[in-house]
């Protein structure tokens, strides 16, 4: 028996919509990363973009467990300006209460995807919105009820 390798014409992409209201961030991000890669499909091929398109709504209501949500000493995200001494930091709580709360989910998923050109292509199939409205109704996305799959998914 030969190893199956999907061809680009055989790949079928579905559209999913996931409600992130009161859902634990890390659990959501790991499931979304697997769906973006296509690992939930029997036709998974590691070198092809065989994952689905995912829409996440209500990103501002995602939950962080433990002390990570504390704005003062919670989970810290670092970045560097490129200049000497230019390291900047912010917390997950500040980002969630700021202008772009969807960035917390995007960063969590991005760090679970491979860091190469294929990973960038897979990340382009992720659409995150802070509130419950999205402009992708024409694609007829299927609702994926992530919160009810495991009691630990919802907080």
Curated annotation (Swiss-Prot):
Keywords (A to Z) from UniProt: Ribonucleoprotein, Ribosomal protein
GO MF annotation, one: structural constituent of ribosome
Gene Ontology cellular-component annotations: cytosolic large ribosomal subunit
Disulfide bonds listed in the record: none
Gene3D superfamilies associated with the record: Ribosomal protein L13
Domain of life: Bacteria
Record text on subunit structure and interactions: Part of the 50S ribosomal subunit.
Listed NCBIfam families: rplM_bact
Function as written in the Swiss-Prot or TrEMBL entry: This protein is one of the early assembly proteins of the 50S ribosomal subunit, although it is not seen to bind rRNA by itself. It is important during the early stages of 50S assembly.
Family, per entry: Belongs to the universal ribosomal protein uL13 family.
Protein name, as recorded: Large ribosomal subunit protein uL13
Native source species: Rickettsia bellii (strain OSU 85-389)
């Amino acid at each position: 028996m030969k190893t199956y390798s999907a061809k680009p014409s055989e790949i079928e992409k579905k559209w999913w919509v996931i409600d992130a209201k009161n859902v634990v961030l890390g659990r959501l991000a790991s499931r979304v990363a697997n769906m973006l890669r296509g690992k939930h499909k029997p036709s998974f091929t590691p070198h092809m973009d065989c994952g689905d398109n995912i829409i996440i709504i209500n990103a501002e209501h995602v939950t962080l467990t433990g002390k990570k949500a504390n704005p003062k000493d919670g989970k810290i995200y670092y970045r560097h300006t490129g200049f000497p001494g230019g390291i900047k930091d912010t917390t997950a709580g500040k980002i969630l209460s700021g202008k772009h709360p969807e960035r917390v989910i995007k960063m969590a998923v991005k760090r679970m995807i491979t860091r190469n050109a294929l990973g960038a292509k897979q990340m382009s199939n992720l659409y995150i919105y802070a509130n419950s409205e999205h402009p992708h109704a024409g694609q007829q996305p299927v609702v994926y009820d992530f919160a009810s799959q495991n009691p630990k998914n919802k907080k």
